[in-house]
Amino acid sequence: DSSPSRGLGDVYKRQMILAANHLINLGAKNVLIKGGHLQSKTVEDIFLNKSNLKIFRNLRRNTKNTHGTGCTLSSAITTFFSCGKSIIKACDKGIKYVNSAILTNPKYGKGHGPINHLNSIKIEKRYR
């Protein structure tokens, strides 16, 4: 077993950074590599561009309801960036939004369910 929980987390982190750097060398302006599929207590997402390396660290959420996190994250980052946030701030806010969506997932079905895309909407009490 070569999972990060066995002490190889730094190896995976270096591989993620090398992969991001390769994409930058191919012409990408900004790269965010998600670390959510690695088995560890902490999720590390790697952001890289020509002038910044940023590692976003969050506690792993113990749930099987994470379907749609990648698409949701890219949409959230795009939204925050288009509203004038810096790319790093947009990534930070997007990751926080997805974490909140994971924490408030509706727990549908028995398999891997969706996250709660409406987590940031406050619904009036009379409509609940």
Task: Report each predicted region and the residues it spans.
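Single conserved hydrophobic/aromatic residue that forms the stacking wall/gate
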Residues: 1-12
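Gly/Ser/Thr-rich beta-alpha loop segments that engage phosphate groups in nucleotides
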Residues: 9, 37-38, 70-72, 76, ...
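Conserved phosphate-donor
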Residues: 17-58, 62-63, 108
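Charged C-terminal helix
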Residues: 88-128
